Design a protein with these regions (language model features):
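Short, low-complexity, intrinsically disordered N-terminal peptides in bacterial proteins
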Residues: 1-10, 209-226
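N-terminal phosphate/diphosphate-binding loop that engages ATP/GTP or pyrophosphate donors
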Residues: 3-7, 23-85, 89, 94-97
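Glycine-rich phosphate-binding P-loop
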Residues: 11-25
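General beta-strand structural signal in soluble alpha/beta enzymes
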Residues: 36-39, 62-65, 105-109, 136, ...
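Conserved catalytic-core segment of NTP-binding enzymes
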Residues: 43, 110-198
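Switch II (G3) loop of P-loop NTPases
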Residues: 91, 95-119
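C-terminal binding/interaction regions
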Residues: 184-218
Length: 226
């Protein structure tokens, strides 16, 4: 079933599990005013606990993370191990509740757009079917160009409403490294998708003020445009 567009939402995906989606999402949340945050599905500890420490969230644990499984595996496999299924209707209900309470909602995915959410759907399918404007976080390292092209190709094939790409520095980089590994002009030329932010390296990802400064320097407000 295809749902109506959700103009107040942003889905944050990435090229893989270590792209830095959680940090980028937290930084965007800290600079977006009144905002709800949802980790769509989590397998193993990590992201939801980070959000609870960094963000002053006025929402229930179920709204923050409607689908949680213990084993750090792909969600359908983690659910199978517990004798459960991934119930996306439950996630949709949590998202609807957040939309009713907040003018903006950030939804973080698990892994990349090609990562499985259920036995039938990938993250890209969720974004396409729920019509979620999507940002894809690409870590600035060797291989970034190919990762960006691959993620955009999958998004287009499935029908994901792409908002743009975010280049994320996971370590201190020189200007030469940035240009060599993730040249903005070439990536935009190959993908036809704008790079809406270049997120700088954050030395202390557990310091909200550092995250705020990084988001402001990257002009992350543009991520909501479109």
């Amino acid at each position: 079933m295809t749902h109506s567009p959700l103009g107040r939402c942003l889905f944050i995906s990435g090229s893989d599990t270590s792209a830095g989606k959680t940090v980028v999402t937290a930084a965007l949340a800290l600079t977006s005013g009144q905002v709800g945050v949802m980790k769509l599905v989590q397998a193993g500890a990590g992201d939801r606990e980070y959000y609870q420490k960094i963000l002053a969230l006025d929402q229930s644990p179920t709204e923050l993370n409607p689908l949680y499984f213990t084993a750090p595996l792909a969600p359908p496999l983690a659910a199978q191990r517990e004798g459960r299924t991934v119930d996306l209707a439950q996630a949709w209900q949590s998202l609807t509740q957040l939309r009713q309470r907040f003018p903006r909602v950030l939804i973080e995915g698990a892994g990349g757009l090609g990562s499985p959410v259920t036995w039938e759907w990938t993250a890209a399918d969720v974004c396409a079917q729920w019509r979620l404007p999507t940002l894809v976080v690409i870590p600035v390292r060797l291989g970034a160009i190919g990762q960006a092209v691959a993620q955009v190709a999958l998004a287009r094939q499935v029908g994901v409403p792409l908002r743009g790409l975010v280049l994320n520095e996971l370590a201190p980089l020189t200007p030469e490294q940035r240009q060599d590994w993730a040249p903005v002009g070439l990536i935009q030329q190959l993908t036809g998708v704008p790079i809406v932010a270049q997120f700088p390296y954050v030395a202390d990802i557990h310091a909200p003020e550092c995250l705020k400064q990084a988001a402001l320097s990257a002009d992350m407000a543009w991520c909501w445009s479109g």
